[in-house]
């Protein structure tokens, strides 16, 4: 019966199959902190976020760039100790430039804590970056391979990251990744550093990289995707990257990050679940986003999907009436879907009927009944009239006062 109530064009003939692997890397505590408008939180807040990432089944977390200074290294060490002492399933990685002085702090923390850290070694790869820096391709190859060999020689797994991959020449990508495989990289990361890529471009570059790795004897080498939101395409590009062969994609809480931010890892989790690509309990999603908001001093927009205040609220008469009818049928499944493309209960939320100037009397009656107040004709009329005269939704306290 339920299958007949919604025709889902998203999964009709030709829908992409589930990727062979679906892994997530949370960049909130590294790239997220590069946002110009957030605060680097104290270590207790970082620990809380790490635990919530773990609850959501996120595979890896980038816990910082320890080469940035003593505090950064101390925080990375503290988070590694938290992973060990709390026996968290989430694994750690850290960013570093392709220079020894950035790699050494990662080695030190690993040796002190006994916690393996994947070293995410990054270097620019696009011609525009090469021109600005005065680099040639030989420099990129030498800098990359020496850094990878040094990290691997000191017991680190390496994710080799080419910044600005989505604007790099094919021959440069081919050479850098081929040499990275030979030097011992375990994974590579295709980075859309400036948020330049479209979904088609994402699929093309990820598919190209897969071919390069296979030709270099790196069929076992996994591909990461790291995207930004400068064109508003961060989230959809993550899905395109999975379709094209990436096995791990990056994101941040609430999409925070450099400039316009990174792909929203919270919304990525939602979409992966709705696509059927993951199956896990995501009811901690609200707690995760609230914790990130409080730690980083970044408010959650009211209209933010799923976790924003407005996501599952309505005061519009026609919409509310349909939801109320579903509730009166005793069908929570129906109420969760009749005016929502995202089932609230799957993510720890519920539908909420509000009262405002566009409401009908059914909104008022439902609010009264759900708050244990008998909806007399006079009371309904009093609240309904007040709502029509208001220029916004009435808060619960105002409605309670009208109940007298």
Regions found by a protein language model. Name each.
Residues 1-98, 355, 359, 370, ...:
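N-terminal capping/small domains of soluble enzymes
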Residues 41-44, 48, 70-74, 101, ...:
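Conserved active-site and cofactor/substrate-binding residues in soluble primary-metabolism enzymes
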Residues 197-330:
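Catalytic alpha/beta core domains of metabolic enzymes, predominantly
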Residues 1-30, 278-404:
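A mid-to-C-terminal "edge-of-domain" accessory segment
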Residues 29, 65-66, 95-98, 122-126, ...:
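Short, ordered loop/turn segments at secondary-structure junctions
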Residues 31, 63, 123, 194, ...:
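Short glycine-rich loop/turn motifs that provide flexible caps or phosphate-binding loops at active sites
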Residues 19, 24, 35-60, 76-87, ...:
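Alpha/beta enzyme core
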